[in-house]
Amino acid sequence: MGLKCLLAAPTGRAAKRLTEVTGHDASTIHRLLEAGIDPNTGMMVFTKDESNPLKADAFIIDEMSMVDIQLLHCLLRAIPGNKRLILVGDPDQLPPVGPGFPFGDMLRSNTLPVVRLTEIFRQAQESLIVMNAHRVNRGEAPDLRSRKSDFFFLPARSEQEVAQTIVDLCARRLPTNMGIPPEQIQVLTPTRKGGVGTWNLNRVLQASLNPPAPTKKERSFGDFSFREGDRVMQIRNNYDILWKKLDGSAVGSGIFNGDIGTVRAISMEQETVTVVFDDREADYDFTMLGELEPAYAMTVHKSQGSEYRAVILSAWNGSPYLLSRSVLYTAITRARELLIIVGREECVAAMTQNAKVGRRYSGLKLRLQGKTE
């Protein structure tokens, strides 16, 4: 048809995945809209809007469940009214961190053309990952008894046992018995705090997978000591940080929220930490280390838009807001080949039954239906 099409997603990780599966360049929505900082207010602003619209015939936005009402508003302002906009996403995943849930509102309004995709290509149809994802989505308990599939449940009697089991899976059992190296395993947890939160799990996983050694330099920042060899994640979009290809073939700028890399070197003389992201590397001044977090374990929220060869999920007592069906469903659907849940079966059952999501009032559904609140 000869149409010019632009692809985008809410996070850098999701945009990268979109590029990989389509073979076409994709960017973050922020980069598409040319985000910048207003020097007078210090607030983020977008160059693209009604007066300076995006130039394309069609726009495809992936992972729409992560897009809040404010970002969608800015996106729509920048797209001329006579163009095509295709929004792709899974409304059963976690809602955005920011205000509203516009993707869900649009679907529930029954005013827009919708195509529901039902065929799964990531796993075989008989995959227990797929079947349990469907079961959880319907509010049915997942099958936790199977021992001959891609989905396993390992019971634990305490938070300490959960953490110890996860460390053993990452450091010994999966690499030895299934040939899955630690760097292809992602530990997910609903919470940041507590014995099975990201802070403690990253601490014990670092101690096991990347212990201190005389040959490894370290740099402390906050409550964590970054060490050469550590797995880390960028936690906010940085459009200005410079990177270079490992083969020296190109240079550029921009490391994005959700990008995962490995600490290659720490220079005390230059006060920098060098992180390798796939085929690129970037230098972080010590003052910039607040943009990085350890990534041996991450929250389920942070995993949205990504997929991993193997996922280990902790399931333990916590806030009903965090232990919800959407959290469990999102975690299960991050796994490509293997999913292991470690914890309490009662917790998994409670998550399956907890379909409550904090109510979000944006008025979008009613506006689309031509009604007033």
Regions found by a protein language model. Give the residues of each.
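Conserved two-lobed SF2 helicase motor
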Residues: 26-29, 296
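C-terminal accessory regions
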Residues: 138, 246-247, 257-373
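Conserved helicase motor core of P-loop NTPases
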Residues: 88-253, 264
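Structural motif
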Residues: 58-62, 86, 188, 233, ...
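Short gly/ser/thr-rich secondary-structure transition/capping motifs
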Residues: 38-47, 69, 214-216, 322
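Residue-level recognition of short, solvent-exposed, well-ordered loop/turn junctions
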Residues: 80, 225-228, 256, 303
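Conserved helicase motor core of SF1/SF2 NTP-dependent helicases
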Residues: 2-3, 9-16, 21, 29-37, ...
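Acidic, low-complexity intrinsically disordered tails
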Residues: 39-42, 48-52, 362-373
